Amino acid sequence: MADVLSRFNSGKLWDFKGGIHPPEMKSQSNSQPLRHLPLGTDFYIPLKQHLGTTGNLLIKEGDYVLKGQALTKGDGLRMLPVHAPTSGTIKSIKPYVATHPSGLDEPTIHLQADGLDQWIERNPIDDFSTLSSEQLIHKIYQAGIAGLGGAVFPTAAKIQSAEQKVKLLIINGAECEPYITCDDRLMRERADEIIKGIRILRYILHPEKVVIAIEDNKPEAISAIRNALQGANDISIRVIPTKYPSGATKQLIYLLTGIEVPSGERSSSIGVLMQNVGTMFAIKRAIINDEPLIERVVTLTGNKIAEKGNYWVRLGTPISQILSDAGYQFDKHFPIFAGGPMMGLELPNLNAPVTKLVNCLLAPDYLEYAEPEAEQACIRCSSCSDACPVNLMPQQLYWFARSEDHKKSEEYALKDCIECGICAYVCPSHIPLIQYFRQEKAKIWQIKEKQKKSDEAKIRFEAKQARMEREEQERKARSQRAAQARREELAQTKGEDPVKAALERLKAKKANETESTQIKTLTSEKGEVLPDNTDLMAQRKARRLARQQAASQVENQEQQTQPTNAKKAAVAAALARAKAKKLAQANSTSEAISNSQTAENQVEKTKSAVEKTQENSTALDPKKAAVAAAIARAKAKKLAQTNSTSEAISNSQTAENEVEKTKSAVEKTEENSTALDAKKAAIAAAIARAKAKKLAQANSASEAISNSQTAENEVEKTKSAVEKTQQNSTALDPKKAAVAAAIARAKAKKLAQANSTSEAISNSQTAENEVEKTKSAVEKTQENSTALDPKKAAVAAAIARAKAKKLAKTQATLENNQE
């Protein structure tokens, strides 16, 4: 720090590297005093006119505002407010064309002036020393003052950041642009106010040295400042040589001290602060006169403007209106520049307003402006590097900008570029280098801004997560404290900790589950370890016994719940047999016809009884069909006994005994069987018909041949009917079996009446053959059955035995007759 002051106090001037001497055109505008333009009717005030963020609106559409009234309010020193340049009504707040080469829109307040130009209430002061540094900085901030030299950095923020660090305060009056003369005229005409503003700033910062630097091409301004100082030694004046860009911050500091500001750092890092002379004037007006920054001096120059000079211009005035008031000759072939020819920006739309940034409006003609020549390839001549006042390598930065290699651009210190435009001015290939560098800076800024927002979002997220975790921990701690208090309360009342007891129960339960899951084993005789299945086998045995018990219970229930209809039918059949037997014993051969009729009546009664029984029963049991067949056989035997001789009677008794045995076997079988198959009933009917036919043949002799043929046909018909019934019906209806039995009885009765005993032997043999055929049909039927029940097999065996016995007796009888 002492080095900076010592080098400055030496009085020596250092020349910076590079720089140029462009043709100077200041005389066009600096010969006329400062003037005011007519007050306009419409003003467009952008919400942001500085390097920072936009303030918050204090007004709305339709509001009436006064001159100097704040329209926005900031939350920090970098968020400067804007003020009404005159009194009037707020017509709208919407996007409007910006004073920028892009021509984009930005939020803007449209103020329609009322022509009264009425100020707000002001509180001017004479002695600024009555206020503290903080109060003065705050008033500077409230006035919306930004750097008027071109950077438009918020002045209050700049002063506050450099407070207690500044040893050398430099007031920049160099104004190195070849066309701009606003600072020159301001120093000539308002030197006293500039000096007062410098002293206000010195009061705030307390620097050891204060100096005003002015180029040697402004002798009138130098003289005016010296006259304003009146011999005071608190502020020094340094006249520097004219060279572009000596007005740049780093170059001017080097000129006065010979010290370079480190790359990427501010001048305050070496104890130096720099402000523009226009900014000093604005500070004086804000502190002493209590006037915000609502107007500034603007240079109107160029051969296209008739009335060249420097004018006081209200901020927000459309540029087209200013040029019109200054006698601008509109020509679409020649652009308008905001700023000087070296650093100025071409304006695409003249309706854009004047802002704090605009210090000059340049309207050149064909003598001052030529169309840019076509860009050519870089020839690596190094002219740009030689002329660069910041010691950069513009040709390298150009390649990095074109390839969008942002990392390399930053490595080659693109941020140190002051955009002076010298590189483009000296380039023989006519490459607009300054445009490439501005675009590259904008891209890098966007990337960093995006990264900054991402980092801020990450910080907010992490802070939120930390807060949520902290709240969760606090909640758990509260819950634990409440649970602990509850446990202590229960322990005091019951003498046992409930949580501890619950944990013990849980441990015991887990231990039991562990024991139950262990596999039991046993060791075999060979020493092998095998799983112990004793428990499993016991469980299986218990289940098997339970199933058997359930099955026996079901059988007992079925036996107990059998319908009584079957028993009634069996009783009726037994009564019929007894009656028929008595009638057979009492009647003689002479009364055969009447006995036959009586038997026939009995058969009809029995049939009607059976049919009634069938009608009264909702589901006829196959047992009834078997009983009916037995009755038919008994009646047939009785008729045969009546029509035969004494030997036939004995044979009939023998047959009756056989039928009784067969019936008893059938009844036993029926008792053992819960459901007789319908096919068995049909088989029994066929057997009965065969027996009846055989007996009839034994008792008849006169018409043996014809009767035998008739019987054969009847048997064949019966057999075919039975077979068809078996084929067409999967389960024969019991009623059909009863009908078949009745038909068999009728046929047997007719055969008994017609047959004689002459050809008994042949007829007996024929009947025997029929019985054998019937037996074979029965056996086939039994073999074709899909699932033969053991009970059915027992019934079939009993029938077979009865038939065999009957045939043996019949043969013996026939042999006796032949003898």
From Swiss-Prot:
[4Fe-4S] cluster 1 binds at residues 378, 381, 384, 427. It is a peripheral membrane protein. Its EC number is 7.-.-.-. GO terms for cellular component: plasma membrane. Residues 368-398, 408-437 form the 4Fe-4S ferredoxin-type domain. It is found in: Cell inner membrane. Binds 2 [4Fe-4S] clusters per subunit. Its main location: membrane. GO terms for biological process: electron transport chain. Residues 465-477, 485-513, 602-614, 658-671, 770-782 have a biased composition (Basic and acidic residues). It is an enzyme of class 7 (translocase). InterPro entries: 4Fe4S_Fe-S-bd, 4Fe4S_Fe_S_CS, Ion_transpt_RnfC/RsxC, Nuo51_FMN-bd, Nuo51_FMN-bd_sf, RnfC_N. Transmembrane segments: none annotated. Residues 554-565, 587-601, 641-656, 699-712, 755-768 have a biased composition (Polar residues). Keywords: 4Fe-4S, Cell inner membrane, Cell membrane, Electron transport, Iron, Iron-sulfur, Membrane, Metal-binding, Repeat, Translocase, Transport. Its cofactor is [4Fe-4S] cluster. [4Fe-4S] cluster 2 binds at residues 388, 417, 420, 423. Part of a membrane-bound complex that couples electron transfer with translocation of ions across the membrane. The complex is composed of six subunits: RnfA, RnfB, RnfC, RnfD, RnfE and RnfG. Belongs to the 4Fe4S bacterial-type ferredoxin family. RnfC subfamily. This is Ion-translocating oxidoreductase complex subunit C. It comes from Haemophilus influenzae (strain ATCC 51907 / DSM 11121 / KW20 / Rd). The gene is rnfC.
